Amino acid sequence: MLELLAESPVPAPCIVAADPAGAVCDVPTLLTTRLPGHPPGLPHDMDAVLMQLAEALVVIHAVDDRATKRIPGYRTYIDLTSAAPPRWSRRPQLWERALELASAQPPPGPRCLIHRDYHPENTLRSRGRLSGIVDWTSGSWGPAAVDIGHMRWNLAVAYGLDAAAAFLRLYRSVTSVVPEDQHYWDLVTLLDLVCNLDPHDLPPRFDLARL
């Protein structure tokens, strides 16, 4: 994945050395360049950060489509057709209906390179600008709406629904390739992450009640 990104304008780390079998380092090891910056603090300058996150995602999604032959295809983390409502839910019937909808045939939509875990904590910012995008472990070829949905879910539980709506609006303002199936993939993303989630494992600022 990082070799592919090195040929693109995406600000990702570059590979310095790799020992995937652990022959030298005893464990699988990857050494990369260090990117400048730190994860952004959204509440301070929310609009500016969200715009940069939206612009960067457009760059990711525009990576040469030859990538489809070099990376795995998108797949959900869990089998939504056999998933059950979260044990902590107070409205299991609502979750059952959501799972029914998410298990339907995915709607057609643009496919491209996706980060698969795109959210503020996997980006870096330096001197007021986005300086890097990290953690490409789950990178794959799939619906553009998956990355948007993943960002929106993280923004919703960390900062509220207004932040999630703002990101979608900004993304749509900087690209002509707009997924028409966003609500479906928002639902799939949420269920894929939350059905087996223990709320106690979330960072303190994450509040599922915001959903």
Language-model features: locations:
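Helix-rich C-terminal or lid/interface subdomains of diverse kinases
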Residues: 150-211
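An alpha-helical support segment within catalytic cores of ATP-dependent transferases
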Residues: 20-23, 46, 58-116, 127, ...
